[in-house]
């Protein structure tokens, strides 16, 4: 008799995705981040659900409802900090996952890659709206500054901003709609992640060598289920350590002050995971130019597959491209640092140079270097 997991309509979907899935035998720990992102999403949805039971999306009570969660709700402080720091873990896994894709040429699976870029945008939008909900100083001013950027769009800009605000400033209507979107988007992200997996399983996983691995596949279970469980345990260990020992390490002290439209904080800055994009935005003196650079800093990922000029897929055997990849990583870390600094000398010029280097590396230097490496191999 055939095993039930292979014949049952529902179980065979799970079976073909997580049990009998043929996987390359040589994928490293860099391939763990997909499953870790799934775990992060589940943690965020569950903690978010319990927070939503106690949160009120009204400008008068939002801040106090968060205080109430931390003080009066059983383990409310734990749920709140798991959710806040879970977002940071989510973005760490996201950045490493995207970095892995860039390094090993996973972007050659076009559909999977493009849905991944769409997922990145969706997660960033969700995180931004979630940051507004506690209604602290940085929540309010962050929302004001970022939504105001849309006014740079010619002709419809100012109308668009007022439409998003639901009035003439960030107020009750804005908070309520941000809460609604923040609640629904994670479920849309989960659906998109399903489509992401669907397209990935059409082609099969890439591997570190970038070569076809059809001749050497192993079943996902037990090999990679065990490997993923190790990753999940390390993720949970890191997250719980962060939550229990220094829950406010990655937050902004300004957000413990209730929102006040009459008092602007000295340095308005987003959460750490948006600082690189914020630095690119600030490095251009023109408003519309800055907004375009901000969007393009992420959208540029969708162009990467078309800039692949190498005869080899992975960077595993391409030392020059490897050097450039790590320069790109260092550049992004520099941008992250600059994004958190005040707008003054020397930070302005460092930010501008780092922004130029970011776009130059991806659009010009890396494709040319790949062609040079092809010539070295006389291909």
UniProtKB/Swiss-Prot annotation:
Signal peptide: none annotated. A ubiquinone binds at residue 201. InterPro entries: Cyt_b/b6_C, Cyt_b/b6_C_sf, Cyt_b/b6_N, Cytb/b6-like_sf, Cytochrome_b, Cytochrome_b_C_euk/bac, Cytochrome_b_N_euk/bac, Di-haem_cyt_TM. Binds 2 heme b groups non-covalently. The chain crosses the membrane at residues 33-53, 77-98, 113-133, 178-198, 226-246, 288-308, 320-340, 347-367. It is found in: Mitochondrion inner membrane. GO terms for molecular function: metal ion binding; ubiquinol-cytochrome-c reductase activity. The keyword Electron transport applies. Its cofactor is heme b. One of its GO terms (cellular component) is mitochondrial inner membrane. Keywords: Electron transport, Heme, Iron, Membrane, Metal-binding, Mitochondrion, Mitochondrion inner membrane, Respiratory chain, Transmembrane, Transmembrane helix, Transport, Ubiquinone. Component of the ubiquinol-cytochrome c reductase complex (complex III or cytochrome b-c1 complex) that is part of the mitochondrial respiratory chain. The b-c1 complex mediates electron transfer from ubiquinol to cytochrome c. Contributes to the generation of a proton gradient across the mitochondrial membrane that is then used for ATP synthesis. Belongs to the cytochrome b family. Heme 1 (or BL or b562) is low-potential and absorbs at about 562 nm, and heme 2 (or BH or b566) is high-potential and absorbs at about 566 nm. This is Cytochrome b. It comes from Sorex granarius. The gene is MT-CYB.
